[in-house]
Structures are given as structure tokens and as C-alpha cells.
Amino acid sequence: MNPTKPSIWNWTQPQQDVPYILAISIGVLLILGLSEFVKRKGVSQEWSRKTAHIGAGLLAIPFPWMFKSVWPIIILCSSFFLIMLISKSMNFFQGVHGVKRKSHGAFVFPLVIILVFCLAQDPLHYAIPIAVLSLSDAMAALIGKRYGKHQFHTLGETRSMEGSTAFFFPTFLLVHIPLLLFTDTGRTECVLMAFGCSILVTAFEMISVRGLDNIFIPFGTWYVLDNYAAYLPEELAYRIGFMFILFIFFVAAIRYHIFTRTGAVGGFLVIYGMLSLGWDGFFIPALSLFGPLLAAVILHHRFGRERIPPMGVSHTFQSTIVAMLVLLIFDNTKQSWLLYPFLTASSAGTIIIALRIVKNMSLYRLPIILGLSTVSPLVALYSETHHIKDVRHLLIAWVGTLTAISIYWYSTRFQAILICPKCQTQTLERRHCGIETQILSGHPFFTQARIGLISIFCATVFCSLWVSQYA
């Protein structure tokens, strides 16, 4: 039987925790010393870093069974954070800090432990995410470094399919075995939960850079476990089936050079996130945007004369992040009027993606703008969602979408035009021919993706302020 968790903010018997605090502190120092020893023996930097990563994670896993309060964990993790900060500035512990790439993982790791401990209502929902972060992430890095042949790039960092595969299988076991042995969850549910969680967390790992996987992996694992625990086997099977459909769609999108691999992974996470957060009246209108977007892809494939650069993960997220934020607010507040700014943000983001696809086909721009701005409000209206309180608010959402596109269209005159030093091709992309591009004209801040994000945000705020007055 799992131990129940009392109020984590009450520290009634601190003297009982002192031996544990001292033991863990000594353990951390020994792990850092071992990492330095491994580095000085000539072992690769990645191995010495992951030695500390695995050791610190294994020390943190039993915290819910050792401590009744969060305060000892705050003391331990804050001390570790300060040690990492001071050692970084003084060039100590190069077994941890000596990695060549930019990484904030050593500083994020202790903060994440505190936050996951505070969020998790079940000890296993804390222990499993920390175990995945400690073991699966280390396995992915080491296998990818040694055997990674099929490489791809995400925001300047290199990943490999071998490393991601090495992340998936340990994650499946780390989720499946504890649920099977220490909970009342049925066998079928355990397999489905572990499979779905492994897919989603592996996707997060593929697009995380600069040590931010130390945030996305544990929070993603915790969130999926916390939500999947309430689902019946049929619901879990339905969601995994939807993942499979998305997988087929984005494989085709990669095949036709619409997305890069990481851009497709980002799109997969965004759409699945919309399903998870906004099934209640939000998801079907958002899903309807795929029809006109697919039409834009087909038009470009049939009649486009210039091959467009595939969309990366930054373009994907900057076109959809505002809609996802609206959904997160709805998930916490259940305010039905948020449907309208969501329609504005999702429609505008999809239009910007479509305009990028048909940028040299001016004949089709206006039909795409009108089609994509209209289809989502109409589907919301005729799907008879209970969130529709006033049809006039749909008109506000439609005006908000056109406002976003107008801001975007006007602002593109200020965007940075870049040139590739190697082939002298003008482009809007930060990288071309495998190297960094140089600014030819415009302001470096106003990239195409940032202009799109600013336009969507402004129009969504406009729609929210207008509709909220009548909510």
C-alpha cells in the first residue's frame, strides 16, 4: 500500500530529518567526487556528467518515503543549486560543467525536484518522473553519443534516432513496472499508460535543448501519469490510436518537406495537447483547420515553383503557443468564453503556416485566409458546443483572426532578410546550407516566426478583452 502524503508545508519534527539530510549531503559530495574522478581518468565528458546526473537522481527518488515535509528537500536542493552556481563561476567540478554545449541542466535539476515533489499527490507520481529523468535521459545521451548514426538537429543541437529509441524503452519499463507492482492499476491499463507516457515524454526529449529536458521530461511524465490515472482502458486505447494517426500524418509531412523532424514532433505534441486540454468543445473546431491547411499543402505540391524550407520546431511552437496558453487557462478556470480567443489564436496561427507554404502563389492567398478564418468558427457553431453563448462573439473571433493576419502582413516589411554566405541565397531562415545566415536587411529581432507570434498574441488579447466584457 502506498503511503499517504500529509501536508508538505508542515515541518513538525525536523530533528528526525537531520540524519537523512546529512546522509544525502554526504552522498551528493561523493557523487560529485566520483564524477571528477571519472573525468580525470580520461573518460569522456558525457560519461562523467551523466555519472553525477544518475547518482543525484537516484538519491532523490526515495524523498517521499524519507521526508514528510517539503522543507528538507528545499534545504537540500537549494544547497545543491548554490554549489553548482559557485562551482560554475570558479571552474570547479568540471566533470559536471565541462561539457562544451550550452546547458542549464545542473541548475534546473534541483529546482525541478522541489516542484515535482510539491505537485505529485502520490509518491509514485514523484518517483517515476525522477527515475525517468535520471536513467532514461542518461541512457539516451550515452547511446546517442556512441551509436547515433541517424542524426537530426533541433535549435542548433544534435539528436539521434538511436538516442531517442534508447530513451523510449527504459521509460516504458520505468513507468510500467512500478504501476504494475505497487498500484491497483490493471495490467491492460499499465501497458497502455506506460506506452502513451513513453511516446509523449520521448517526444519532449527529442525537442529539448540546453538542459531544458530536465524540465520537460519530469513534468511531462508527471502530467501524463496524473491525467491517465483517471482514464478507462477504452479511453487510453482511443488516445493511443489518435497518436498513431498523428504519427502517420507527420511522417507524410516530413516526406513532403513541410516539417523538419523536430518540427513534426512539435506539431505532434501541440495537437495532442489540444486534444488533452480542450476536448470539451475546443478540439473539434481546431481539428477542422486541417482541411484548408492540407489544401494549401496540396496546392503547393501541385503548382508551387519554389521549394519552401521545412518548418522547424521554433516555427511550429511560435505559431501555436498562444492557442495552447489559452487552453491551459481554460483547463484551470473552465471559463467558457475562452473559446473565442482560442479560435482567434488557432485560426491565425494556422493561416500564418499556410501563407508560409504558398508564399509565392499570390492567387491562393486570399482564399486561404478567408477559408481558414471562417471554417473554425462555423464548425464551432454547428457542432453545438455548449460554450457558444452568443453567435456575435464568433464574429469577434473572426475579426480577431483577420486583425492578427493584418498585423502580420504589415509587419513583414520590417522582418530580417538573411543571406547565405555559402550560396548567396536570400532566405528568412537562421540557417542555410548547414551554416548560420547573415542579415541583409531589416531588424534582426523581427524574424518571421516572431512577427507571427506577436501578431497572434496582440489579436488574441484584443479578442479576450472584447469578449470578456460580455461574459
Name what the model sees in each region:
Residues 1-42, 47-93, 106-154, 160, ...:
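Hydrophobic alpha-helical transmembrane segments
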Residues 93-102:
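Short acidic (Asp/Glu) patches
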